[in-house]
């Protein structure tokens, strides 16, 4: 081996070691969830609010139970309830919370979970929800299973922002990562068995507005992030 070759290899090795050390130094290690009040979904989410009351005759389920082991790894807590209004209209609420939204642990989107359960994804649109905390983006799905139609509205909070899509999510993760922090994440999903999509989405909007308004002020940012219009 000539001196030139040896020197080149030494420089390459030194660069690799430096890059490895830099990557390790920049790797986020502080969980945002550990710095704030602990999350307890069962006590945070009221069982009665506005015209909605929890239905004691049954409850909704987190979709995709075959992947329970994976879901348990991704989420620290999940909550599933069914609420009804005085006219008997039922809305299913599912909330999943994960304290670690790093690359290896990602929130499970309904676009993935529903088809895994045998549902057909008929449409997907992105709109907004007007909540007591401000306006946030929300995703609306139309899913079907046989003759059953289930319109879905959901939104995802990563750290302190509502995100739509993987690019927005990654940007929020990078912002936290620059400070050495790992953001937490929450996915809030409301759905109903209803063949009339427009009616379903309107009632889901009303439900979400009432829900957020009934949650204690100190917990609202967990559900809705920092609103985009403030």
Explain the meaning of each model-derived region.
Residues 1-2:
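N-terminal Lys/Arg-rich, disordered targeting/topogenic segments
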Residues 39, 46-47, 77, 182, ...:
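A generic "functional-site adjacency" signal
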Residues 6-14, 18-20, 24, 31, ...:
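A short, solvent-exposed beta-edge/loop patch
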Residues 29-46:
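Alpha-helical transmembrane signal-anchor/signal-peptide segments
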Residues 44-59, 185-192:
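Hydrophobic/aromatic-rich, well-ordered segments within soluble, folded domains that form packed cores
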Residues 53-56, 60-176:
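Short, solvent-exposed recognition patches
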